[in-house]
Swiss-Prot record:
It comes from Rhodomonas sp. (strain CS 24) (Chroomonas sp. (strain CS24)). It holds the Pfam family Phycobilisome. Light-harvesting photosynthetic tetrapyrrole chromophore-protein from the phycobiliprotein complex. (2R,3E)-phycoerythrobilin 3 binds at K28, N35, D39, P154, Q155, G156, D157, C158. Its main location: plastid. Contains three covalently linked phycoerythrobilin chromophores. This is B-phycoerythrin beta chain. It is found in: Plastid, Chloroplast thylakoid membrane. The gene is cpeB.
Length: 177
């Protein structure tokens, strides 16, 4: 897992060069937006249970067969596993947003996820739909447009961070589809 700083140093070291120019400008921007980044992560994690439960509920509303006796969300145990998986994905997205790097998400969450779900018979389209609902909710919290929020969210233009969060969810969708 690399954060924004480690990534810049590693890249410069691999070229046997000093850190400078565009790399320093990118780090300056990362630092200047640090409070927005922290507030964005806080707004997501403070509303994590709502984001995940809304995503799973939305997925089930669109595909009620998931809670029928042969469905993948039938029984409390399977529903709990579905909610747990959503929480794990959201947690790793928040880690990626905090560090400004997707490697923690890719290495510790997405690696082998599609194969695991396939072996369990979990429908990829339902998973992808739940992730897209989580994406919409998380972006709304970062942009301060969510209707239900537990705390104040980042002030100022957070469209760049919202886009970054959306990109992390897109990686999840691509990994499970």
């Amino acid at each position: 897992m690399l954060d924004a700083f480690s990534r810049v140093v590693t890249n410069a070291d691999s070229k046997a060069a000093y850190v400078g120019g565009a790399d320093l400008q990118a780090l300056k921007k990362f630092i200047s937006e640090g409070n927005k980044r922290l507030d964005s992560v806080n707004s997501i994690v403070s509303n994590a249970s709502c984001i995940v439960s809304d995503a799973v509920s939305g997925m089930i509303c669109e595909n009620p067969s998931l809670i029928s006796p042969s469905g993948n969300c039938y029984t409390n145990r399977r529903m709990a596993a579905c909610l747990r998986d959503g929480e794990i994905i959201l947690r790793y997205v928040s880690y990626a947003l905090l560090s400004g790097d997707a490697s923690v998400l890719e290495d510790r969450c997405l690696n082998g996820l599609k194969e695991t779900y396939s072996s369990l018979g979990v429908p990829a389209n339902s998973n992808a739909r739940a992730v897209s609902i989580m994406k919409a909710c998380a972006v709304a919290f970062v942009n301060n447009t969510a209707s239900q929020k537990k705390l104040s969210t980042p002030q100022g233009d957070c469209s760049g961070l919202a886009s970054e969060v959306g990109g992390y969810f897109d990686k999840v969708t691509a990994a499970i589809s």
